[in-house]
C-alpha cells in the first residue's frame, strides 16, 4: 500500500444502455453477485490510503465492504474528467496531500491489484506525472495513475472547454513529452495476462461477457 496515494472512482454513470439494469446506475450493476462498486473499491483499497467515490448528485450508491469517502459531482453530467477534478480537489485538502491518484472507473469489475501496483510504480518515477496504459493502440485513462499536482492543468483544460481525458493526456504530452509514461500491453500482461482489467461494461452484451468470466473464475477456469 502506498500511503501517498489515493484512489478516485468516478461512479456517476447512468447505465442507460444496460437493458434491465438501466436506471440503477453502473455502480449498482452486479457481476458474480457483487456490485461493480464493491469489486472496484475492494481491489483498489488494498493499494492506496483512501478511496474517494465521485457519485452523481442525488443518486444512491450500493454499500461497499471497504471504507470509502463519497462526494458528489459538482457539475452533473459533465463527464468523468470533471468528476476526477472534483475528487482531486477533495483529496488535496488532506494534510499532507497525496502525491498520486489512481483513477479507476466503476465499470471495470476485473481490475487487477498487480495492474494498480505497476501503474503506481511507473507514476512514481522521476519526471513522470501520468502513467497511462495503452491497449490495442488506445490509451486507457480510466485505469491510470496521475500526479495530484496535475490539478491546475486539469482545471485549465476544463475551463478551455476540454472534456476528454485522452485530450488532456495529449495536451500534457505535447508540452512535456516525458511527463506521460505509456504502459504498453506487453508490460501490462506481466501482471494481468488476459488484460481483463481493461474490460469495461457499456452494453448488455458486455455484461453477459463479464458474467461468464466471473462464473469461470468461480469454477477455477
Residue ranges of model-derived segments:
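Long, charged alpha-helical interface segments
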Residues: 201-202
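Hydrophobic helical membrane-anchoring modules
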Residues: 207-221
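Nucleotide and nucleotide-moiety/phosphate-recognizing core
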Residues: 2-162, 167-197, 212-215
Amino acid at each position: 500500500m502506498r500511503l501517498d496515494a489515493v484512489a478516485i472512482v468516478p461512479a456517476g454513470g447512468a447505465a442507460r444502455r444496460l437493458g434491465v439494469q438501466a436506471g440503477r446506475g453502473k455502480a449498482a450493476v452486479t457481476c458474480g453477485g457483487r456490485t461493480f462498486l464493491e469489486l472496484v473499491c475492494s481491489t483498489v483499497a488494498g493499494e492506496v490510503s483512501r478511496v474517494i467515490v465521485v457519485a452523481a448528485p442525488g443518486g444512491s450508491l450500493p454499500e461497499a465492504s471497504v471504507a470509502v469517502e463519497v462526494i458528489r459531482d459538482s457539475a452533473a453530467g459533465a463527464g468523468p474528467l470533471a468528476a476526477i477534478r472534483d475528487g482531486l480537489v477533495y483529496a488535496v485538502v488532506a494534510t499532507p496531500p497525496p502525491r498520486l491518484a489512481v483513477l479507476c472507473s466503476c465499470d471495470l469489475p476485473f481490475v487487477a491489484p498487480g495492474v494498480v501496483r505497476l501503474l503506481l510504480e511507473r507514476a512514481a518515477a522521476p519526471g513522470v506525472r501520468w502513467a497511462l496504459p495503452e491497449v490495442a493502440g488506445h490509451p486507457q485513462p480510466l485505469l491510470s495513475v496521475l500526479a495530484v499536482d496535475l490539478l491546475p492543468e486539469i482545471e485549465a483544460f476544463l475551463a478551455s472547454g476540454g472534456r476528454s481525458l485522452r485530450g488532456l493526456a495529449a495536451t500534457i504530452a505535447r508540452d512535456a513529452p516525458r511527463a506521460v509514461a505509456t504502459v504498453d500491453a506487453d508490460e501490462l500482461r506481466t501482471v494481468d495476462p488476459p488484460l481483463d482489467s481493461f474490460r469495461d461494461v457499456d452494453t448488455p452484451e458486455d455484461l453477459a461477457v463479464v458474467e461468464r468470466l466471473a462464473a469461470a473464475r468461480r469454477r477455477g477456469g
